[in-house]
Every structure is written in C-alpha cells, then in structure tokens.
Amino acid sequence: MARSIWKGPFVDGYLIKKVQKLMKSGKSEMIKTWSRRSTILPIFVGFTFSVHNGNKFIPVYINEEMVGRKLGEFAPTRTFHGHGADKKVKRK
C-alpha cells in the first residue's frame, strides 16, 4: 500500500543535514548511509550515496529519474547465482 500524500515523503533527518552541509562546502563526497528506507528528494540529485545492502556499501549516483523512489531500491540485497544444473541424463 502506498504512503498517504498528506504525510509526505520519509527521509532520515541526518541525510538532509549531510546533503546541505556538502552543498555549502561545494565538495563532492560520498554520503555513507544505512537508511535504505529514505525517499530520494530533488535536492539529492547529483550526489553519490553509499547505500548498505547488508554486506557492503553500494555506490548509488542520484539522477532525476530516481526522485520519489527509495534508496534501497538501487542497492540489491540478494545475488542470484543461477538455477542448479539438471543432473539427470537425457535419453534420445
């Protein structure tokens, strides 16, 4: 179910503070975060976030198409190694 519009998007407060601090300084550092649940805001465009996937940090560069989605959508938590091979001998 989608979030109510009257509530607005959820973003951890420290992420907004970090982005504003980087905007003032003019630096282009990676912002390290565990907050996969935070919504991407328009002020995040152009920044690179290191999003934790449970094992390591995945670099995610934010562009305009990502606005409104969650940070966790771009850092997959599971790796697919393929299905097991068929061990039965096929007869002709």
Swiss-Prot record:
Protein name: Small ribosomal subunit protein uS19
Record key words, sorted: Ribonucleoprotein, Ribosomal protein, RNA-binding, rRNA-binding
HAMAP family cross-referenced by the UniProt entry: Ribosomal_uS19
Domain of life: Bacteria
GO cellular component: a single term: small ribosomal subunit
Molecular-function GO term, any one: structural constituent of ribosome
Biological classification of the source: Bacteria, Pseudomonadati, Pseudomonadota, Alphaproteobacteria, Rickettsiales
Functional summary from the UniProt entry: Protein S19 forms a complex with S13 that binds strongly to the 16S ribosomal RNA.
Coiled-coil segments: none
One Pfam family cited in the UniProt record for this chain: Ribosomal_S19
Gene3D superfamilies with a match to the protein in the record: 30s Ribosomal Protein S19, Chain A
Family of this protein: Belongs to the universal ribosomal protein uS19 family.
InterPro entries in the cross-refs: Ribosomal_uS19 (IPR002222), Ribosomal_uS19_bac-type (IPR005732), Ribosomal_uS19_CS (IPR020934), Ribosomal_uS19_SF (IPR023575)
SUPFAM superfamilies the record matches: Ribosomal protein S19 (SSF54570)
Disulfide bonding pattern of the chain: none
Gene Ontology biological process: ribosomal small subunit assembly; translation
KW RNA-binding (keyword) present: yes
